[in-house]
Amino acid sequence: MATFIITGNYTVQAIQGMIANPSDRAAAVAPLVEAVGGKLLSYYATTGETDFLMICEAADGEDIIPALMVAGASGTVSNLKTVRAYSSADFMASQKKAAGIAAKFKPAG
């Protein structure tokens, strides 16, 4: 499973709804992620440029996109951004692979 970090913002509509009816947003989002075969690992309310951060697992990016489309179409979130995250072990494997192919590249100039 691939790991994805998703950030976004709540719309005014969402904030009004949360004030009127407080809810556990992780519990609300988890079934959506599960519906595409993924798993919600963590959900955080954040300060700064974004209002929330989620860490999810899914087979690949094509699997997580439908969940993001549904959330975005709800009108309660905006500015959704998704990045694929790699473990330290995965990144080490990439470094070793790069070392093995480095001689194949000829830089410009």
Task: Kindly label every feature range from the protein language model.
Residues 1-109:
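A compositional/biophysical signature of low hydrophobicity enriched in polar/charged and small residues
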